[in-house]
Amino acid sequence: MTNFREILKEKRAWYKTIGKVYCPILKEYIIFNSRGFYHLRYDTHEKERLVKEQIYKFNLLPLVIPVIKNATKIFDYKKQEYSKPLGKYYEIWELREIMGEKSPTEVSVILRKIGTGNITFLSVYDRKIKTKKPPKSR
């Protein structure tokens, strides 16, 4: 298995190439800055995430762009709230899309706008979709 430092270096290099992606549902460009990548590695309280969790989030990164480009609705929106640590108001959007055919996964992309700045990528996670199995015949 490739060691974590190599994975981190590879994913960071790929992330830096993104720059910005247009989001039709928000009618704005989403900026991929260093804060978004930092949040994949550290939680809200600045504590480093477990390596397993970081790799999990890194592996979801390629799905972020299709979710942003193809989202047909905003799943959740948190209106402007004041953040003492940021010293500014912020807004949060959650976009969700189902990705994959064989084993569909619902991918959530979290976007944030601080003050009057740009909307930026903040995080990503997924949820396996449970498919109903036919009842067993007796």
Pin down the residues of each PLM region:
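Ribonuclease/tRNase effector modules and their secretory precursors
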Residues: M1-R138
